[in-house]
Amino acid sequence: MRRNPYFELISPIISGLTRKSRILTKINLMIRVTEQESTYNDIDKMSVLEILKGINDEDKTVPHAVEKVIPQIEKLASAVAERMINGGRLFYIGAGTSGRLGVVDASECPPTFGVPFDWVVGIIAGGDTAIRRAVENAEDDDQQAWIDLQEFKIDANDCLIGLAASGTTPYVIGGLNTARKNGILTGCIVCNEGGPIAAESDFPVEVVVGPEFLTGSTRMKSGTAQKLVLNMLSTTVMIKLGRVKGNKMVDMQLTNHKLVDRGTQMVMDELNIDYEHAADLLIRYGSVRKAVESTHK
């Protein structure tokens, strides 16, 4: 019989569980909405169209779930903005899909808003290797997140947001717990209510999207919900930091032809001038903001 390639990974994890922890794990899985059985039966027998429609129907529910927790998001965004206005930074920690989403959001802030790369930092359990390939047991280490954060010299001026669909990831719990002890503002974006990650957060966001189309596959609705909240959070914070003028990304980095063209269009709209004049100003001053402000001197 061919040996399951994941046996060596799974076996020590299971054998390392005590009888008590197995019972607690079973109870925890029973109450976690993200692990509940899909409401769709026999999806392996569905047609392609039926599968696509089912996934789409489930996805439609996610924005409504996010809408319900806007008051929670408001509290978190306001607190983060206040810290960052006073010189603090924003850190995300997470494992798997949640960790990758944090890395994506952090990575988008410099090109979109022209901020330094260390203003918003995404850290994934297992390091950057885990962005592309799962790292064994990385999310189960409740000490490693704080070690990872220490590389960036995180301190009481900063903010830490834990990302975990389950709300129970040890890597995230440990990082938030130690951060709170060191006076760091903490928050989270999770998809189950009342979990240990929310308990370690000053400003929890608990967006419950229900069982996944594919049972337990939290990269789907849960991941979508987390991405929506991250979009709302980082965009709101950057607006409050003055990185937007009107409705435009005036500090975006002009790193390719598409973005230079977009920047030129922004200058055209703001100053009501033709494309050639706008392009000349953009080339001369190097940014949309400086090009626009140059005419007001």
Language model: regions and residue ranges:
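A short, well-structured juxtamembrane/interface segment
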Residues: K68-R83
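Gly-rich Lys/Arg/Thr-decorated short loops/hinges at beta-loop-alpha junctions or inter-strand turns
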Residues: N56-V62, G122-R132, V260
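Polybasic, lysine-rich low-complexity intrinsically disordered segments
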Residues: N4, I10, K20-I23
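Cofactor-/ligand-binding subdomain signature composed of acidic, glycine-rich
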Residues: I27-A65
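Glycine-rich phosphate-binding loops that contact phosphosugars or nucleotide phosphates
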Residues: F91, A95-L228, V237-L241
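Short, amphipathic alpha-helical interaction segments embedded in low-complexity terminal/linker regions
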Residues: V237-K297
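Short terminal hydrophobic/aromatic SLiMs and anchors at protein ends
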Residues: P12-I14
